[in-house]
Amino acid sequence: MSGNARAIRVGEQMREELAQLLRDEVKDPRIGFVSIVKVEVSRDIRHAKIYVSVLGNDQQKKETMAGLASATGFLRSELAKRLQLRYMPELHFALDESIEHGQRIAQLLVQVREEEKRSEREEGE
């Protein structure tokens, strides 16, 4: 279990460092409003799946993911300088749309509540 705890700890460190690198160091104009949602590191610390949330339309998301793919080498080398690891995991970026799904559900719930209020008012008349 200690290997799993270590992978979680490394993932959290990577999330913090990647967020700072994307904010301060990466100058690719394709990379817009990106949030690092979660980093899952394999037990052997060889692979890291980085879940990102991107603000924008589908085209902007595609461009951002392409920008992240092209910046992977730079990000990996910068992480190697900042984190004291024997092996630097390979970085794999994945789009996380759970925030958008949550916003859509919240929007639908608001619409349902408004319709319920409207129907209650109509019944009362």
UniProtKB/Swiss-Prot annotation:
* UniProt keyword annotations, A-Z: Cytoplasm, Ribosome biogenesis
Q: Name one GO biological process term.
A: maturation of SSU-rRNA
Where does it mainly reside? cytoplasm
Q: Name one GO cellular component term.
A: cytosol
User: Where is it located?
Assistant: Cytoplasm
Concerning InterPro entries, the annotation shows: KH_dom-like_a/b, RbfA, RbfA_dom_sf, Ribosome-bd_factorA_CS
Which SUPFAM superfamilies did the record assign?
Answer: Ribosome-binding factor A, RbfA
For this protein, the record's PROSITE patterns field holds: RBFA
**GO molecular-function term, one example from the UniProt record:** ribosomal small subunit binding
Superkingdom: Bacteria
Q: What does this protein do?
A: One of several proteins that assist in the late maturation steps of the functional core of the 30S ribosomal subunit. Associates with free 30S ribosomal subunits (but not with 30S subunits that are part of 70S ribosomes or polysomes). Required for efficient processing of 16S rRNA. May interact with the 5'-terminal helix region of 16S rRNA.
- Record note on quaternary structure: Monomer. Binds 30S ribosomal subunits, but not 50S ribosomal subunits or 70S ribosomes.
Of which family is this protein a member?
Answer: Belongs to the RbfA family.
**Record-given protein name:** Ribosome-binding factor A
Could you tell me which species this protein originates from? Symbiobacterium thermophilum (strain DSM 24528 / JCM 14929 / IAM 14863 / T)
Q: What is the lineage of its organism?
A: Bacteria, Bacillati, Bacillota, Clostridia, Eubacteriales
